[in-house]
């Protein structure tokens, strides 16, 4: 007796996003120039195990809807009790890496995930604007972090770094 596996639209979309984001670095790296600056919103820094730890920590920081600040202004006070997507990633970056990195790999990968799932919205500040978008839910924020974590894990495996 064989079982039929059905693929829902959501599953198909998730597979497409992961596939695109795993292959995208190879095409982007072939097209980037050595003069790309750290201020470039599409810069793609190399991924390390630290980036995976940063995204996992950001998920811990934002582990409940009560901790989510959906009114981000990209100012992240140390004493904050609620956190936007951007501030959770920045706080995790500072805790784990020792300093904030606005264009660090973990934040950049999260930006690229937002590009894929909300590319038609053309956000000026992807992390802030996606966080503040009235159609964005806490589950959506968690999904961005989950996909980002999965992509970084896949890319590390591809580099032979587990």
Predicted regions and their residues:
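N-terminal low-complexity, Pro/Thr/Ser-rich intrinsically disordered segments
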Residues: 34-58
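Short N-proximal segments of mature Sec-exported proteins
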Residues: 52-112
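Compact alpha-helical subdomains of small soluble proteins
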Residues: 93-162
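Acidic/histidine-rich, surface-exposed loop or edge segments in extracytoplasmic proteins
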Residues: 36-42, 87-90, 123-126
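Short, solvent-exposed segments of well-ordered alpha helices
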Residues: 45-49, 75-79, 132
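Bacterial N-terminal signal peptides
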Residues: 14-26
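Bacterial N-terminal signal peptides that target proteins for export
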Residues: 2-15
